[in-house]
């Protein structure tokens, strides 16, 4: 685990996806819970459970599987902001991923939200990651 929790989440999900594993275990923090709620709501993951192990809370994610074939859906997750280089955007300049098919997760003054929610509320923030 590094100090960049967002990169840890994205890397864990990407590695489990490439290794064709069905579940991922991630340390539970407020930021990780908010990002996972967005991924669950947008349909990129199937299920989330909170588990306590040795006085630490873990989130157990179930990745979304294809109906007829074995393996998970291929989601591309890309971390944008990092501790050494933060990327900020106002609501007018938030990028659209694949013409609106993908999502951008932002950290705003009103919490972590998707690009669509930020545009509707008219607020910008730090661009955390792209998912498509």
UniProtKB/Swiss-Prot annotation:
It is found in: Plastid, Chloroplast. It holds the Pfam family Ribosomal_S8. One of its GO terms (cellular component) is chloroplast. GO terms for biological process: translation. It comes from the Eukaryota. Signal peptide: none annotated. Gene3D superfamilies: 3.30.1370.30, 3.30.1490.10. Its main location: plastid. Part of the 30S ribosomal subunit. One of the primary rRNA binding proteins, it binds directly to 16S rRNA central domain where it helps coordinate assembly of the platform of the 30S subunit. Belongs to the universal ribosomal protein uS8 family. PANTHER family: 40S RIBOSOMAL PROTEIN S15A. This is Small ribosomal subunit protein uS8c. It comes from Drimys granadensis.
């Amino acid at each position: 685990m590094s100090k960049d929790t967002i990169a840890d989440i994205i890397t864990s999900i990407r590695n489990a996806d490439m290794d064709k594993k069905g579940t991922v275990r991630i340390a539970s923090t407020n930021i990780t819970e908010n990002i996972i709620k967005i991924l669950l709501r947008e349909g990129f993951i199937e299920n989330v459970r909170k588990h306590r192990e040795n006085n630490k809370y873990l989130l157990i994610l179930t990745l979304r599987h294809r109906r007829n074939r074995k393996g998970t859906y291929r989601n591309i997750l890309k971390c944008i902001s990092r501790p050494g280089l933060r990327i900020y955007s106002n609501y007018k300049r938030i990028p659209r991923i694949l013409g609106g098919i993908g999502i951008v997760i932002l950290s705003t003054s009103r919490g972590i939200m998707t690009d669509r929610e930020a545009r509707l509320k008219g607020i910008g923030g730090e661009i955390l990651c792209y998912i498509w």
